[in-house]
Design a protein with these regions (language model features):
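Long, compositionally biased stretches
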Residues: 1-67, 84-97
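Short alpha-helix capping/helix-loop boundary micro-motifs
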Residues: 29, 72-79
Length: 97
C-alpha cells in the first residue's frame, strides 16, 4: 500500500452523467503511483474528510490518456461552500478498506 500524501488544488468539475454530480481530477498517473486503476482513499476537500475511490469513469485527458477522478458529494460541497467551477484544496492518501 502507498502511504504517500498527495496534495493539490483543483477546479470542481460538473459531471455530464447523472443528477448533478461533481468531481475533481486526480492529476497523477494512478497506475504508476498505486499499481492499479481503482484506489480506495481517505481524502479531504478544503479540510472536510471523505472516504471514497479514485476511479476511471471514461473521461479522457486532452492528450487522450485516461483521466482518473474523485467524486465530491453534494453534502461536502454544501459544507465547504463550493460548487462546480470553484477551486478547492485536496489531500489524498490510500486506505486499506
Amino acid at each position: 500500500m502507498n502511504k504517500k500524501l498527495y496534495e493539490y488544488d483543483a477546479i470542481i468539475q460538473l459531471s455530464e452523467v447523472g443528477k448533478g454530480g461533481a468531481y475533481v481530477v486526480f492529476p497523477y498517473d494512478v497506475r504508476a503511483e498505486f499499481g492499479k486503476g481503482r484506489v480506495k482513499v481517505h481524502a479531504a476537500f478544503d479540510g472536510e474528510p471523505y472516504d471514497g475511490s479514485i476511479v476511471n469513469m471514461g473521461i479522457k485527458n486532452p492528450d487522450g490518456s485516461v483521466c482518473y477522478i474523485l467524486g465530491i458529494l453534494k453534502d461536502i460541497r454544501k459544507k465547504i461552500g463550493k460548487q462546480p467551477g470553484d477551486i478547492i484544496h485536496i489531500t489524498v492518501t490510500e486506505r486499506e478498506n
